[in-house]
Design a protein with these regions (language model features):
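Membrane-interface helix-loop junctions in multi-pass transport and translocation proteins
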Residues: 1, 48, 111, 119, ...
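Transmembrane alpha-helical core residues of multi-pass small-molecule transporters
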Residues: 57-60, 93-96, 164-171, 193-201
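Transmembrane helix-bundle signature of multi-pass secondary active exporters and lipid flippases
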Residues: 16, 20-76, 100, 135-142
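Short membrane-interface helical motifs at transmembrane helix boundaries
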Residues: 99-129
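Interhelical loop/hinge segments that connect adjacent transmembrane helices in multipass membrane
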Residues: 1-30, 211-221
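Primarily residues marking transmembrane-helix entry/exit sites
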Residues: 11-19, 54, 124, 128
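Small-residue-rich hydrophobic transmembrane alpha-helices
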Residues: 50-103, 145-156, 160
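A late C-terminal transmembrane helix in Major Facilitator Superfamily
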Residues: 135-140, 149-176
Length: 221
């Protein structure tokens, strides 16, 4: 980038204001699954559900986990004529991840992988199938969230992203509480709660960024 001689000096207070919402979001994202595990472990089928979740988290994260990194693209390619292309690329990545996951979990390949590659029992594999199917929703939600996060970073509006973190925790707790008296398997309840938390988090950050009514501003380089 060319030097910007007229740019004001960076102040530490501004860095703190910019970073603390990101730190909060990262902390909540890291703590959501342990929080869910605490709820699940207290159920009657807690031990089995935790075993299922350990497998589901590991396998389900493979097709979509990398989508979190595309949030860096709007800032990396921030010229005005690039943003639409970046948006299409991100959503294309989300569609690719969804097809990848669906091709595995909605076909007999899932049962084969669970029993022959992972090496778990047929009964445990059966309990993994529904949670893995629910995980097919994550590529769409995560790709949209990553794009919105990228816009927030581009516009330096990270404080608008902060409310999404507590909304995710609240949603997870509410959904787990609402499903606690159902006959659903513990791992299924946990996966529904996790996807619900991601979805509400994405909606809240979209609303927060959009609420400012600020057009997407880009810097010419």
């Amino acid at each position: 980038l060319p030097p910007q001689h007229d740019a004001p000096p960076l102040e530490m207070a501004y860095v703190v204001r910019f970073f603390w919402p990101l730190a909060l979001i990262m902390a909540v994202q890291s703590g959501t699954r342990p929080l869910i595990n605490i709820f699940v472990a207290r159920a009657v089928d807690g031990t089995e559900a935790l075993a299922v979740l350990t497998i589901v988290y590991a396998l389900g994260h493979i097709p979509y986990g990398w989508l979190n990194e595309v949030r860096n693209l709007p800032t990396a390619f921030r010229e005005a004529n690039n943003l639409a292309k970046v948006r299409r690329f991100i959503f294309g990545c989300g569609a690719f991840s969804f097809v990848w996951m669906a091709a595995i979990v909605w076909t007999p390949a899932a049962d084969y992988i669970l029993q022959n590659w992972v090496g778990i029992s047929p009964e445990l594999a059966m309990h993994c199938l529904i949670p893995l199917s629910i995980f097919c929703g994550f590529p769409i939600v995560v790709s949209l969230r990553s794009y919105i996060h990228g816009i927030g970073l581009l516009q330096h509006r990270t404080q608008a992203m902060a409310p999404s973190a507590p909304s995710r925790v609240a949603t997870v707790i509410l959904v787990l509480s609402a499903l606690s008296d159902t006959d659903l398997h513990g791992a299924t309840r946990a996966t529904i709660a996790l996807l619900s938390g991601h979805t509400v988090e994405t909606l809240v950050v979209w609303w927060s960024i959009r609420r400012g009514g600020k057009e997407i501003e880009v810097t010419e380089v």
